[in-house]
Amino acid sequence: MAWIQINTTVSEALAEPLSDAFMEVNAASVTFADAKDQPIFEPEIGTTPIWSQTKVIGLFDAEADIPAVINQLATLIPDVPAERYNIEALEDKDWIRAWMDQFQPMQFGSRLWIVPSWCDTPDPKAVNLMLDPGMAFGTGTHPTTALCLTWLDQNPPTDLTVIDYGCGSGVLALAAEKLGAKHVKGTDIDPQAIIASQQNADRNNANIEFKLVKEFQSEPVDLLIANILAGPLKALAPEFIRLMKPNATLILSGLLTNQAADLIAFYQQQGFEFLAQNDLDEWSQLSFTKQVTS
C-alpha cells in the first residue's frame, strides 16, 4: 500500500494541537521528531518530553485528497499556513519488515546482548535478553540505557538485591537478574511501563516483581539503578536513601553531561561517595556508594 507523508516544523506549544488536527483530518498515524537534533528539554514529572522545534509528521493513504487535507489543517491551525506543509510520497513496500530490519542484536560490554525476537542470538553462550524495540520505553538504543547496561556487564550484581527505579521496559532489571542478582524488583509511575516490563520478564523467564511507585515496597537493597531525568533524580534522593543498605551502590543515569557536576555535588551533600562518571554522546551515568553514617 502506498502512502503520503505530510510534515511541518512547529514550536513546542503547537506540537500537540497540530497532532490533534492531523488525527481530525484522518491521518493513519502521527509522529513527532526532533527538528534540530537537540537534547530533549527536561519536563516535570508526569509530563511528556518535547522539543523546542518539533517536526510533526502525518501519514495518509495515497488516495487521500492531499490539497484538501492541507487546507483543512491550515483552517484548524491558523498559525501554520498551507505553504508550510511538506508533502512526500513514500514508496510502496513492506513497512513492517523495513522497520524490523533497522534493528539488530546489540552488545553491551563483553557478554551482554539484547536480541530482537526475530533475530538469531549471535552468541548462544552469552547473556541474551530477548527484547523487541518499542516506541515508549528504552530497550538499549538510548545512550543512557546503554551506559547502564554496560556498567552492569562490567560489574555483575552476583547474589545482590537490586531495584530498577523508573523501570520503563524493565531492561535494566532483566539484565541484573540474568547477570546473577539474587532478587530484583522494578518500579515506575507509568502503568504501561509495568505491563511492558512484566511481559518482557515473562518472555525471558525472569522472576522479577514490578509495581507502580505508589504500590512499591522493598527492604533496603545492595544496588539501586535509576535511569530517569536529573530533576526527578534530585527529588527522589530521600527515597533512594531509604531503599538502600549502608555501603550500597547507586547508579544514576538519564542526565545530560552538562548536568553531571551539579548532580554529583548534590548527592555528595546527601552523604554519598562519588565513584565514577561514564559518558556517551551527550549523556552520562554516575556511580555512588551510600556512606555509613555514624
Swiss-Prot record:
It catalyses: L-lysyl-[protein] + 3 S-adenosyl-L-methionine = N(6),N(6),N(6)-trimethyl-L-lysyl-[protein] + 3 S-adenosyl-L-homocysteine + 3 H(+). GO terms for biological process: methylation. CDD domains: AdoMet_MTases (cd02440). Pfam families: PrmA. It is an enzyme of class 2 (transferase). Its EC number is 2.1.1.-. S-adenosyl-L-methionine binds at T145, G166, D188, N227. One of its GO terms (cellular component) is cytosol. Belongs to the methyltransferase superfamily. PrmA family. Methylates ribosomal protein L11. PANTHER family: ELECTRON TRANSFER FLAVOPROTEIN BETA SUBUNIT LYSINE METHYLTRANSFERASE. HAMAP family: Methyltr_PrmA. This is Ribosomal protein L11 methyltransferase. It comes from Hydrogenovibrio crunogenus (strain DSM 25203 / XCL-2) (Thiomicrospira crunogena). The gene is prmA.
